[in-house]
UniProtKB/Swiss-Prot annotation:
Transmembrane segments: none
Segment forming the signal sequence: none
Cellular localization per UniProt: Cytoplasm
Record's keyword terms, sorted: Cytoplasm, Elongation factor, Protein biosynthesis
MF (Gene Ontology): translation elongation factor activity
Name of the molecule in the record: Elongation factor Ts
Region Involved in Mg(2+) ion dislocation from EF-Tu, residue ranges: 81-84
Known role: Associates with the EF-Tu.GDP complex and induces the exchange of GDP to GTP. It remains bound to the aminoacyl-tRNA.EF-Tu.GTP complex up to the GTP hydrolysis stage on the ribosome.
A cellular-component GO term for this protein: cytoplasm
Organism: Trichlorobacter lovleyi (strain ATCC BAA-1151 / DSM 17278 / SZ)
Pfam families: EF_TS
Similarity remark: Belongs to the EF-Ts family.
Gene3D superfamilies according to UniProt: 1.10.286.20, DNA helicase RuvA subunit, C-terminal domain (1.10.8.10), Elongation factor Ts, dimerisation domain (3.30.479.20)
């Protein structure tokens, strides 16, 4: 198949590889983007942490957590422009929706939109959205949300850069008085802050599927074979690389951003010892604003030409 410039550009953005390398990779795999990324990684030409993705759209991610910390939500609402995303009315609307989700616990977006709004039962959330669009003058979308409810623990959150990134974490604790303490809330916020910075894909290595692990091993094998190493040496090398892989993608095994002498698990264990309890991190969720959405881009040169009546 013919490889387009757009495909090459997308692969370059995803991997950081050179234009000719990207073109060759796409040709080798008949234009399959995911396979092209793997091809470049096997050749040592792409970073494992980079992923194909579209430019972010605008809007805001917000969190809401109950006063006692036993439940929390993360919500993303998109707008068309960054100008509106910084508007106080838009930000108030996002916070209202987050509070509603926390109170009413809808199962999905469809149920959320049909629910009577928690702040005014005479309106549905859909009506509230329509009114906000009319007042603010720009299209908006309630894109996604996630809800955590802690049994024998607490939920913590962290919002970065005014709503560009949001994280929700849940942990259990074997002492009720500690669960409701400010010190425990600080531990959760620290872990959430780390998650915002480090972008883990899984909580622990047990959560990594066999397929994902085998795919990584095959990439390591292919790269090692390029150096001419024998198979028995390759397998030993793979063992070390797999541990590094877990350290890159599993939250509990990542180097803790606020103390690089510890992993996140070691930070949690040290905090538990200090608080005189046992702490287990159960799950996390991370929203990056506009992740996976294609941003509407304008061609300034084309707009000028059109305005001048040129073609």
């Amino acid at each position: 198949m013919a490889i387009t410039a757009a495909q090459i550009n997308e692969l370059r953005k995803a991997t950081g590889a050179g234009m000719l390398d990207c073109k060759k990779a796409l040709e080798e795999v008949d234009g399959d983007m995911e396979q092209a990324v793997d091809y470049l990684r096997k050749k040592g030409l792409a970073a494992a942490s980079k992923k194909a993705g579209r430019a972010a759209t605008e809007g805001m991610v917000a969190a809401a957590v109950t006063a006692n910390g036993n439940a929390g939500v993360l919500v993303e609402i998109n707008s068309e422009t960054d100008f509106v995303a910084k508007n106080d009315k838009f930000q108030d609307f996002v916070k209202q929706v987050a509070d509603h989700v926390l109170q009413k616990n809808p199962a999905n977006i469809e149920e959320l939109m049909a629910q009577p709004f928690a702040g005014d039962a005479s309106k549905t959330v859909q009506t509230l959205l329509n009114e906000a669009i009319a007042v603010i003058g720009e299209n908006m979308q309630i894109r996604r949300f996630v809800s955590f409810s802690a049994d024998g623990g607490a939920v913590g959150s962290y919002i970065h850069a005014g709503g560009k990134i949001g994280v929700l974490v849940e942990a259990t604790c074997d002492k009720a008085d500690v669960c409701s303490s400010e010190a425990f809330a600080t531990v959760l916020k620290d872990v959430a802050m780390h998650t915002a910075a480090a972008s883990p894909q899984f909580l622990c290595r047990e959560d990594v599927s066999a397929d994902v692990l085998e795919r990584e091993k095959e990439i390591y094998r292919a790269k090692a074979r390029e150096t001419g190493k024998p198979d028995n040496i390759i397998e030993k090398i793979i063992g070390g690389q797999v541990n590094k892989f877990y350290g890159d993608i599993c939250l509990l095994e990542q180097v803790y951003v606020k103390d690089t002498d510890k992993t996140v698990q070691q930070y949690i264990d040290a905090s538990a010892k200090q608080l005189g309890c046992s702490i287990t991190l159960k799950r996390f969720a991370k929203f990056v604003l506009g992740e996976g959405l294609e941003k509407k881009e304008s061609d300034f040169a084309a707009e000028v030409a059109a305005a001048a009546g040129l073609k």
